[in-house]
């Protein structure tokens, strides 16, 4: 976990102008008091690494001071643009959550761009919102805490639970999700669970992992019309909202080659912090469903954080 030194804290009364270095800033739930960018939005605090500034200086042949790129906090020791939305910066009681990497350049409306024809903030600056406020001074350090995504995979199969055969679908989902997280650079923890086809056990386990704020919950099995298929009707009462489009599109896409896909009652939705997907039980089906769901996972994660569309 890298330690990030704070070289300067900076404020301005107007947007689109350089910020001036000050001895201390006061972070509140709305951002930095007395700074033009404070407010109830996701870009309350801007940060830029001195390493990015120095690289830009070498490219344009000019020197820049703290706050010249309108950053609130100038740092050293970590290339901030390697962070991702959901990562956190902590200094004592102060905690910031990264919400955006880079931004659209203001072009000629930006003082730096006007002078140099380019700017570093749109590509290498980051933005954050305040989760816990306090007073922050130059010389302090941030601990960088990457967002660790929690995945819980629940296989429903009485026969697999009794050892009649091995669970292959749950591990296949775990493999696909692990590959997805590796591609995105997401730290993750993937936990597999195996339970019989019982309403009580599924309800209890779902309630537990939702309470633990699991980010993504995948179930496999129990989505058909057989006498032991109980997954959708057990999951649905726990949802605050459904997300019907994903499963509808999967059924539409794969039913052209296999009409039996239309018999799946798979659903998706949100319960508290958790996004839940109920998948069929076959290995082939979980490959198809998980592959399609992964297309939307990053967007869903950021929307759930309140980071827009």
Predicted regions and their residues:
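Electropositive, beta-rich accessory/interaction domains or terminal extensions
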Residues: 1-103
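Mid-chain, well-packed structural core segment of small domains
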Residues: 77-109, 241-262, 266
């Amino acid at each position: 976990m890298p330690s990030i030194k704070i070289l300067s804290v900076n404020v301005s009364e107007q947007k689109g102008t350089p910020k001036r270095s000050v001895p201390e800033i006061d972070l509140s739930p709305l951002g930095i008091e007395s700074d033009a960018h404070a407010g109830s939005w996701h870009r309350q605090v801007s940060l830029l690494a001195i390493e990015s500034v120095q690289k830009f200086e070498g490219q344009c042949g000019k020197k820049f001071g703290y706050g010249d790129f309108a950053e609130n906090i100038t740092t050293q020791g970590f290339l901030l643009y390697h962070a991702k939305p959901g990562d956190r910066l902590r200094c004592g009681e102060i905690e910031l959550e990264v919400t955006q990497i880079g931004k659209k350049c203001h072009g000629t409306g930006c003082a730096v761009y006007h002078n140099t024809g380019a700017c570093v903030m749109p590509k290498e600056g980051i933005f954050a919102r305040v989760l816990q406020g306090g007073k922050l001074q130059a010389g302090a350090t941030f601990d960088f805490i990457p967002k660790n995504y929690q995945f819980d995979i629940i296989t429903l199969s009485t026969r697999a639970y009794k050892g009649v055969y091995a669970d292959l679908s749950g591990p296949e989902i775990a493999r696909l999700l692990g590959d997805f997280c590796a591609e995105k650079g997401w730290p993750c923890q993937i936990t597999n669970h195996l339970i019989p086809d019982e309403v009580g056990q599924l309800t209890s386990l779902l309630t537990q992992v939702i309470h633990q704020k699991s980010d993504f919950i995948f179930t496999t099995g129990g989505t058909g019309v057989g006498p032991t298929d109980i997954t959708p009707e057990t999951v649905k009462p726990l949802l605050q909202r459904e997300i019907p489009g994903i499963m509808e599109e999967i059924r539409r896409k794969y039913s052209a080659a296999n009409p039996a896909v239309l018999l799946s009652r798979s659903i998706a939705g949100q319960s508290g912090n958790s996004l839940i997907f109920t998948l069929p039980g076959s290995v082939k089906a979980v490959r198809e469903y998980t592959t399609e769901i992964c297309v939307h996972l990053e967007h869903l994660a950021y929307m759930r954080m309140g980071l827009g569309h």
